[in-house]
């Protein structure tokens, strides 16, 4: 199987946008011409039931899995071929919106002693930070807009308003999470080092506190991600050298120091006597952004109907089986266009995991076709409202705080 991609190649797949596990290209200039990437995984078309098929896909033969892959490949290439000026205008429009909201919010908070200015400034800054992280940072760092060859909107140059340095986040998210999606013991986004999130994880007494752990994590989510990505538990296990972790902690501190200075020193100083009011507004905006992103992200892979997988499934996994795993390991959120924008289009989590390097504004366009493919192959297309899905997430976190807890069957398409 051959995939054509227009994003620049990199010597480190961990920082590449898009389908990093499929990329095996040599180093190239930052804005290289399109390269052809060969899928190194073996194809297993035999007409028999795949030995590694997850429960909701157990009825599919290898031939059907490869046919499904061909349809999804064709859909991806259709979108790639149609990218153009309208997409470029979209991302420039969102950047202008985000920067306008931030400028307006910061400006209003100069007068933060006035309650109305405080409320307006805090609200504008909260939305600006959400857009920065969700629709801009996350998606640009995936390489979704690299095809424009714009050095200012590129996965190799973009930095975001987030505690986690862009390069560190790309390694842990673009590579580890999108390669090993919902594979127990490999996908760190499953949170297995922090909470018990599957019944297969051994229960320990400290799990009783995980509802409180989850609450605390939601309040400091950006910092939790940043520290989590350093994998300090591996240092304790002796599988990661302290020297490496120490260097990563220094990089993290440099970024965190800038973030703290910006929000809690520099901009509050502009308010003069309103210093503390502005600092409180910035703290509120950061906290609300953290709570929102935590809810959206947890709803992408934790609700009922989403499957997790054994690591053995990765052995000889074909492109088609990778697609199936992404679909069964992800869940969508339903809502309005404004809601989708505020989630960074991660409300289309299934489409994002199938095609992480396609422009985010295209996910809503292709979602009906992806759903139709799922229905035709009798695969679940898990979706629901944010309150409904987040309620299921919280219920699961509480349930797994106690011993036991068997897996729930795959949900029917919502």
What is each model feature region?
Residues 19-47:
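Long, low-complexity intrinsically disordered regions
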Residues 116, 290, 294, 301-307, ...:
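Flexible loop/turn segments at secondary-structure boundaries
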Residues 127-247, 314-404:
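Membrane-embedded catalytic scaffold of the fatty acid hydroxylase/desaturase
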Residues 1-25:
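N-terminal acidic, proline/glycine-rich, low-complexity intrinsically disordered segments
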Residues 377, 405-414:
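Acidic, carboxylate-rich catalytic segments that either coordinate divalent cations
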